[in-house]
């Protein structure tokens, strides 16, 4: 496995055998390699993301039945579709297509990612929990429900995501092994050692004293960005590749790409409103991660990589 020289003082970590730089200090040195250029107009970028998001939502609307008790199923429907979409479902579809698969092969997994993201978002925006931005305008629909619904319903949404995966199995196409592998990927990513662990650490970080060293650096954001957004997007890319019948090296290259893309999203989301010094440091880390992500795509030179600029485009 190639480990790129970041020219910074960092401690390596590994997630699913993927090298992850642990940024701990500033550096005025740049990467020695020249990043690969992938260009796409801003209009095309939004068009690709909007198109795949619309396809995923259409698939979900066919899959979700609003039935009694309405207090559960109607709220589930509203929570899922009012949650701002992230890049993971689109990345899952793009990875599948890159390795020769069709969008339909990845649609159930992409929809499950959308569903589980909604559950995570709901838990992140519970009122009166001390979490960052618990009253975000984006969570207005969620916060219109009673706290007991907000607290318990995400735990019902997650199994629905796994149900989507299980129901996508088709014995006539001999894909049971791939579906099972994707389910395992999901359990690792969204279980107690994945997203839940990241949410716990983010909760701890929200309690930092405003004068503490941790509160004045971007270091506290590394672990949540790694285990939350990073792990989710790594899972998305790997699952898309698996469902597209990729070989192992392709799966791992796309997993690594997804990890870096997710971490970019994590740092951008956490430090977009930070002080000038924090924002500058976060931007430096994002630039490093962007270059690393581009390096992973070099393996796929000669294929249609245009959609992948969607995931490196700074919103």
UniProtKB/Swiss-Prot annotation:
Name one molecular function that GO assigns to this entry: metal ion binding
Which residues are recorded as binding Mg(2+) 2?
124, 130
The record's similarity note reads:
Belongs to the FPP/GGPP synthase family.
Which cysteines share a disulfide bond?
A: none
Chief place of localization: plastid
Instruction: Report the cofactor remark.
Output: Binds 2 Mg(2+) ions per subunit.
- Which tissues and organs express this gene's product? Mainly expressed in trichomes, and, to a lower extent, in roots, leaves, flowers and stems.
Q: Which domain of life is it from?
A: Eukaryota
Gene, per the UniProt record: GPPS.ssu1
Keyword Membrane assigned to the entry: answer is: yes
Q: How does it sit in the membrane?
A: Peripheral membrane protein
User: What organism does this protein naturally occur in?
Assistant: Cannabis sativa (Hemp)
Residues that, per the record, bind Mg(2+) 1: 124, 130
Localization annotation: Plastid, Chloroplast thylakoid membrane; Plastid, Chloroplast
Q: What InterPro entries does the annotation carry?
A: Isoprenoid_synthase_dom_sf
- The molecule here is called Heterodimeric geranylgeranyl pyrophosphate synthase small subunit 1, chloroplastic
**Which sequence ranges are marked TM in the entry?**
none
According to its UniProt entry, the function of this protein is described as:
Heterodimeric geranyl(geranyl)-diphosphate (GPP) synthase small subunit. The small subunit alone is inactive in vitro while the large subunit GGPPS1 catalyzes mainly the production of geranygeranyl-diphosphate in vitro. Upon association of the two subunits, the product profile changes and the production of gerany-diphosphate is strongly increased.
Q: How does it assemble?
A: Part of a heterodimeric geranyl(geranyl)diphosphate synthase.
User: GO CC annotations?
Assistant: chloroplast thylakoid membrane
In which residues is dimethylallyl diphosphate bound?
Answer: 228, 265, 280
Coiled-coil residue spans: none
Q: Which cofactor does it need?
A: Mg(2+)
Keyword Magnesium included in the entry's annotation: yes
Q: Which UniProt keywords apply?
A: Chloroplast, Magnesium, Membrane, Metal-binding, Plastid, Thylakoid, Transit peptide
